[in-house]
Structures are given as C-alpha cells and as structure tokens.
Amino acid sequence: MASHRRDSIALSGEAAQFIEKSRDNKMDYDWFASRIKVEYSDNNLSQDFTAAVRMRRDSILWISLQGPFGIEGGRILITRDSIFVINKLSNEYLRQPISYLSRLLPIQTNLPQLQDFLLGYFLMFSDAAPDYRGLEDSLHLIRAESPEFRYDSKLYPQNYTLAKSVLTDKMLNQQMNVTFDAYSTEQGKAFSNERNIDIKQGNKNLNMHLVFTKIKVNEVLNFPFEIGPAMREVDTIRF
C-alpha cells in the first residue's frame, strides 16, 4: 500500500464530530506494555504464541515472541525509520526500512500510526478525507478513500469506540478486517482487550486472534535488543 502520512488534517462536516469523539478515547501515555496471547493461522500452519509488547510513544515499538513454556523465538524492534528482527532459533537477523511492514500487514505506515493501530484507535490518513456514511448494522460508518486505498470504520454509538474496521489496498488486492471486543477501562479510557484480524493478500489468507493481558501504562521500560556477532543477515524472516 502506498505510504500514508499521519499528518494532521482539517476535519469538517458530519464525520468530524464522530472522529473527534472516537479519538477522545485515546489514553494519554508515554510508555505502554502488554502481553498478547496470539492464535495464528494461515494457508499452511496454525500456531499459538505470546507477544510481549513494549512501546514508547512516537519513539519505539519492541516485541518479544515467545512459544510454549515461555521460550523466546525472536524479537522485533521498530523505530521511526527502521525495523529490526532477530530469530533466535535460526540465528538470523533482518534489518529493513519501516516500509518493510507492508510485507507483514496490508498497510505501509509510520511508527505513530502503527502504535495507534495496536492500541485500537481510529486511524487518520492525510491523503483521504473521511466521510460519514450513516448507520450500518446500528453502527456509525465512516469511510476514508483515495484512488489507492479505502478505510472503513464502524463505531459503537454509545461511546464511539471502534467495533470494526476494514482497510483495503486497491492497487495490490490486499485487505485487512479487524473486529474489536472485550472493552475495559485503562487510564480512564476505553480499551479493546480482544481483537480478531483477517488478512487477505492475493491467494494468501491469515487470521490472528489477539487477547491483551497484563497491561501497564506509564511505567518506564527498557528495550533490550542485541544482534549477536554470529547471526546471519537475511532478507526475510519467518518464525
């Protein structure tokens, strides 16, 4: 998907009131941590693992991937311009610009927007003005569309949190469907503790069911990440 900046855009019209109310649900954080239980499946395999996630707002995203018995298989480090991945099982590492994320998700984005996505917030794109489309299935539907992509969001009318979102890449025939469930309160704001993500990339289909646990907000974190001298650099990594 073409790169979409998260620059501020002037909101107007009926969509503005719903978007502003939705983004009022964003927690005020500098540091965020959670353990995410992941059930993953695609055309070829199914596996369960845990992702330990740590973030510093607008600065860094760190993920430790852990299998059964807490055995760590790899780590991911994302900065504002780069992504680094190490696979401890194969002794390999990857180093790429942040645009590499488009291989993992049908969206090419910047770090602040990726953090908003992980936290379950309404996404803003500077090259597509949002438009309110009325009620659909008793949910407020907002659409942002450009020649390259379309972002459909459905908001609960009670508190304007996200119920569903669909991000479609028209150019590459990719689509991501996300549902948001099990809302609780974190730092006085609504937070979705359970997500279901379906991704279609050409003939490939994958699903991830996420359950957020052990959430910590504004506790100072560290982000240990070391590429060992014996590790081999590769162009792509699969765990």
Question: Can you say where each PLM-predicted feature lies in the sequence?
Answer:
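N-terminal leader/targeting segments and the immediate start of mature chains
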Residues: 1-46, 236-239
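Edge/loop elements at the starts and ends of beta-strands within beta-rich repeat scaffolds
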Residues: 24-32, 43-47, 54, 58-59, ...
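Extended beta-sheet lipid-handling architectures
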Residues: 31-36, 48, 64, 78-80, ...
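Hydrophobic lipid-interacting interfaces of membrane-associated proteins
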Residues: 39-41, 68, 185, 202
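An acidic-aromatic
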Residues: 61-112
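C-terminal low-complexity, charged extensions that often adopt amphipathic alpha-helices
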Residues: 104-107, 115-135
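Gly/Pro-enriched, hydrophobic low-complexity segments
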Residues: 130-239
